[in-house]
Amino acid sequence: MGQTVTTPLSLTLQHWGDVQRIASNQSVDVKKRRWVTFCSAEWPTFNVGWPQDGTFNLGVISQVKSRVFCPGPHGHPDQVPYIVTWEALAYDPPPWVKPFVSPKPPPLPTAPVLPPGPSAQPPSRSALYPALTPSIKSKPPKPQVLPDSGGPLIDLLTEDPPPYGAQPSSSARENNEEEAATTSEVSPPSPMVSRLRGRRDPPAADSTTSQAFPLRMGGDGQLQYWPFSSSDLYNWKNNNPSFSEDPGKLTALIESVLITHQPTWDDCQQLLGTLLTGEEKQRVLLEARKAVRGNDGRPTQLPNEVNAAFPLERPDWDYTTTEGRNHLVLYRQLLLAGLQNAGRSPTNLAKVKGITQGPNESPSAFLERLKEAYRRYTPYDPEDPGQETNVSMSFIWQSAPDIGRKLERLEDLKSKTLGDLVREAEKIFNKRETPEEREERIRREIEEKEERRRAEDEQRERERDRRRHREMSKLLATVVIGQRQDRQGGERRRPQLDKDQCAYCKEKGHWAKDCPKKPRGPRGPRPQTSLLTLGD
């Protein structure tokens, strides 16, 4: 019997319930189909060593994450929840992942590890609030580079940094280089460095929280605030469609910003004010407040509970405490719910029926557009198993004509799932002829049609000639027979008569006009004229 090869991708699909639970802990939502697509088709194209079957290597995951988080049009905001979940699986592997995770390298001798202090806390697993606990550092304190907290912050990406202090010794420099190399192999710097102001240490190897957030602990143990940069806001606004034009894409962008940047309440207001219009923002806030749930888990309209969970005025939350961070987590979750609900247009099935497959559009891309139309113009979730029949029928009827006709003729169509229909449509799509083949086929069809038309014309001409020949033959035969009969009949009607012989009764002594045997009609007979002979 053959053996089935287990890969990281197949392993996650076998334990999909655990994957969704881990994603939920990260405050994100993942879908199985897109999980497979990104792992097997998208991430291998980044050329960072990601295999089609997936991997739990932290270095490769970090490189893919840097490409996904790339700001501007080169980023992939829709893939953020998936790579964050992959990273969570690799950093804190469940029992079924541990056999596939390579052991972490032991620390170098030159970097001794100190035992954790009594106040050390494990890093937070949540992806929607900042980790405010400073990490224990074994390296000696570095000379201060930035001015004190009262002075202005300097953007090291756009301005020249201030001069450093005394140069360290060669041995210290070598130790620092080795430590930096070891750290960069595990987790490269975040691509969104424009979010930070000043110099920061690279993240630790076992940290799962992004370091690009407004609130983080400075080197002196004081909480520092790092606001959004104007370039980030400008790029996000100009490189993405408006919320009214494409709410799904802008919602995915804001979701990725909430995960990677860990914004505060003020940052959220700045983000909404930049990316949304006034009317759109009010609609989002209203939908978010409708999503607030009471203690019984059902939506509530009590003003005190709604204002406590999603305040419209600046709250006095202390982000250094667990309670304050929990408030911020809930606020971001409600904000995402408001964006998703506000992005839904009024129910309009005509819009859904108007989504048809393009001439060169793949069935998978068409299905994604169709599902997006269901989410936007109907209250139904296309991922709901109860709606699979409706989505399948729309997929068949609104596919390209050649694909739709073949899908309708499938045997046992009622038992086919949506995935089966997509696979059949992909087969039909891939077997389509190329433009050159289509032109050649059309040319051959035209030539064959012309050849058939010429053959039919020749056949009709031959039939016409045969018919004309038959008619002429009949006519000639009739003429010949008539002439023959005329010749034969003339000899009988005109016998040789004597000069005084009657042509009617053949008697001599009178002519036919005076023949007494010839009937005269109602008129009386004419007086007979006697003929005088030479003897008289």
Swiss-Prot record:
InterPro entries xrefs: G_retro_matrix, G_retro_matrix_sf, Gag_p12, Gag_P30, Retrov_capsid_N, Retroviral_Gag-Pol_poly, Retrovr_matrix, Znf_CCHC
Q: Where is the composition biased (Basic and acidic residues)?
A: 449-464, 484-500, 508-517
Instruction: Region Disordered: list its residue ranges.
Output: 108-218, 449-469, 481-500, 508-536
CCHC-type zinc finger positions in the chain? 500-517
Coordinates of motif LYPX(n)L motif in the sequence? 128-132
Q: Where is the lipid attached (N-myristoyl glycine)?
A: 2
Cellular component GO terms held in the UniProt record: host cell late endosome membrane; host cell plasma membrane; host multivesicular body; membrane; viral nucleocapsid
Stored PROSITE patterns: ZF_CCHC (PS50158)
Where are stretches of biased composition, namely Pro residues?
Answer: 108-121
Q: Which residues are modified to Phosphoserine?
A: 190
Summarize the PTM comment: RNA-binding phosphoprotein p12 is phosphorylated on serine residues.
Q: Name one Pfam family in it.
A: Gag_p12
Motif (PTAP/PSAP motif) on chain: 109-112
* Protein name as annotated: Gag polyprotein
Q: What is this protein's gene name?
A: gag
